[in-house]
């Protein structure tokens, strides 16, 4: 497996890998990484679809990419913010046919939609029950705060092992608009990994200027289950890929001889029956280790979701622990799943049932929420919320079968253990109705109407996810296994807890990249995997981000000590009349 960039490799079709007709594949899980691996097995690996088996412990595919209507109401555990430089994602989705538009791909549909209806927010944050917080597109960083971010940016990864964000940032950053935007957009907490924070800054340096108003983002038409997962499932079914639902993989055994490592058997449980599948070198095993939505609990309008982080037999953490015990190169799951109090948050899907609540939404987002176009344009954060509540409406309807006179609002709170401001209970102890009441309070509904509207004008389903942020926990090299560990003969790891270079976790792209790299490595597919977009090496993006992060202030306006200030003045004299001066002026750096 090797990396590439540019159109030459992107448009090429690889030859059929040698011996692939004699190989089979077993995939543990059916999340985005697993489905991506299956797609690349049949598309570029040209493996027979009937030789590919997907084991999913739930009754439906998709993993964390959900979006369902249950008897208790619509449920979206989360949403995905996409980027124009998700190179692997677009490499695959241009091959996946749309389910709605004949002759178009999922990428075509997505591209047209976001061209015609570009995303941007008109209100990023509120205070005092629905008033605009007037962040006004500013990061609000002092020079000291900007230097703290710069220091982290240039710190080698080796020095960031097991370090927390608070090891680098103090209140100069943590009390700024920058941190408000960042933590609520990406779900970072102060105690999370400084290494991952650095990787995020470098990965999305080209989007720094688009963070305050979300012009950096793109979204699918519907929830990601309907917009991404279902088209992938139909594509795979067309090849004859075998899906095994309600089927747990409870153990994997490895034959390790010196540096050679081979997956030798898989233990599978279905309908109470346990069976073992013996593997040979021609049987490829793709393992989704860990999982951000494991042990999640779902509440209802009149039921709290609760908080139960118990790791049960057959879930992703249990399986990874069994695997990790067999070899040090298989990672250290305990680094991620040992303290769910530091990795949880709770979300809720609020469905409006009449015309009473939408007026308050429209007052804040300044758009008609029933238009079918961009509504909030990303999350609206309640700056003075004890739960640090954020909420969003993507284009409605979010579900194909959603009534046109209803809206689906997604709400989440980073602090599930803190009492609310109106409902004086922790979010995790609140029913759907009570979470809706807290939200209604913060969007400006008069207090004498809140309970009535939460009861009769909305249906709310909460979901608690104990491990949703666990991949952000401080980590060191080796805590996540390589996608294909050194010496591995017939297996690979997939998903957010498999290690790949330079990319950032908690993204659709990361999951899909692990799937592509796993297949290309094990089948030796002779085509380049598109490298992570290299904006961090582009001087134009670096200059633009530097200026935007300081709210448009030039580097000559920095509050520098005398000696550095004189040195900068002398350096600027030396570049007068050069291309360097020209580009610095073009990007308003001087």
Predicted regions and their residues:
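Helical element adjacent to the flavin cofactor pocket in flavoenzyme catalytic cores
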Residues: 202-284, 288-290, 302-303, 308-317
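Rossmann-like flavin
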Residues: 99-206, 217-219
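A short, Lys/Arg-enriched amphipathic alpha-helix followed by its capping loop at the start of a domain
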Residues: 37-50, 235-241
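Extreme N-terminal leader/targeting segments of oxidoreductases
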Residues: 1-25, 43-51, 545, 549-590
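Glycine-rich FAD pyrophosphate-binding loop
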Residues: 42-69
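Conserved FAD-binding subdomain of flavin-dependent enzymes
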Residues: 72-112
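C-terminal segments that line or cap access tunnels to active or ligand-binding sites in enzymes
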Residues: 205-220, 282-284, 289-514, 520-537
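Glycine-rich Rossmann-fold phosphate-binding loop(s) that bind the pyrophosphate
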Residues: 29-32
């Amino acid at each position: 497996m090797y990396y590439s960039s540019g159109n030459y490799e992107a448009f090429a079709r690889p030859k059929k890998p040698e011996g692939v007709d004699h190989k089979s594949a077993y995939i543990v899980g059916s999340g985005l990484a697993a489905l991506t691996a299956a797609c690349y097995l049949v598309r570029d690996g040209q493996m027979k679809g009937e030789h590919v088996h997907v084991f999913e412990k739930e009754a439906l595919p998709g993993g964390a990419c959900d979006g369902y209507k249950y008897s208790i109401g619509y449920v979206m555990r989360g949403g995905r913010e996409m980027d124009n430089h998700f190179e692997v994602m677009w490499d695959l989705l241009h091959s996946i046919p749309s389910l709605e538009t004949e002759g178009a791909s999922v990428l075509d549909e997505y591209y047209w939609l976001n061209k015609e209806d570009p995303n941007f927010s008109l209100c990023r944050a509120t205070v005092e029950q629905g008033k605009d917080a007037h962040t006004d597109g500013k990061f609000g960083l002092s020079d000291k705060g900007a230097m703290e971010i710069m220091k982290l940016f240039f710190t080698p990864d080796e020095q960031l092992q097991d370090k927390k964000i608070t090891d680098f940032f103090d209140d100069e950053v943590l009390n700024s608009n920058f941190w408000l935007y960042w933590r609520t957009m990406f779900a970072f907490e102060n105690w999370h990994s400084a290494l991952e924070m650095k990787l995020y800054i470098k990965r999305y340096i080209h989007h720094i200027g688009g963070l305050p108003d979300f012009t950096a983002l793109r979204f699918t038409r519907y929830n990601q289950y309907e917009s991404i997962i279902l088209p992938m499932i139909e594509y795979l079914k067309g090849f004859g890929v075998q899906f095994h639902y309600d089927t747990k993989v409870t153990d994997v055994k490895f034959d390790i001889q010196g540096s050679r490592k081979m997956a030798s058997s898989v233990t599978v449980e279905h309908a109470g029956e346990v069976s073992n599948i013996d593997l040979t070198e021609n049987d490829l095993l793709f393992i989704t280790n860990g999982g951000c939505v494991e042990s999640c609990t779902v509440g209802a309008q009149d039921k709290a979701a609760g908080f139960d982080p118990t790791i049960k037999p057959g879930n992703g953490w249990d399986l990874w622990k069994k695997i990790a015990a067999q070899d040090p190169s298989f990672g250290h799951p305990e680094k991620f799943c040992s303290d769910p109090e530091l990795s949880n948050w709770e979300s809720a899907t609020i469905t409006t049932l009449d015309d009473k609540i939408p007026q308050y939404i429209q007052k804040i987002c300044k758009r008609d929420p029933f238009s079918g176009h961009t509504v909030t344009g990303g999350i609206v954060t309640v700056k003075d919320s004890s739960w640090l509540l954020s909420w969003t409406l993507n284009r409605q309807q979010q579900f194909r079968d959603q009534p046109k006179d209803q809206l689906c609002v997604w709400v989440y709170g980073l602090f599930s253990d803190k009492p609310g401001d109106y409902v004086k209970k922790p979010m995790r102890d609140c029913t759907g109705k009570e979470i809706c009441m807290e939200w209604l309070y913060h969007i400006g509904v008069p207090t004498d109407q809140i309970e009535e509207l939460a009861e009769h004008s909305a249906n709310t389903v909460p979901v608690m996810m104990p491990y949703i942020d666990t991949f952000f926990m401080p980590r060191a090299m080796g805590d996540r296994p390589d996608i294909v560990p050194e010496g591995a003969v017939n297996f690979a790891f997939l998903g957010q807890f498999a290690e790949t270079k330079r990319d950032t976790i908690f993204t659709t792209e990361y999951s899909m990249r692990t799937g592509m790299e796993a297949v290309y490595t094990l089948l030796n597919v002779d085509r380049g995997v598109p490298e992570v977009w290299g904006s961090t090496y582009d001087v134009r993006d670096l200059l633009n981000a530097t200026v935007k992060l300081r709210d448009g202030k030039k580097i000559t306006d920095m509050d520098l000590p005398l000696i550095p200030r004189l040195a900068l003045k002398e350096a600027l004299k030396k570049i007068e009349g050069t291309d360097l001066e020209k580009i610095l002026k073009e990007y308003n750096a001087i």
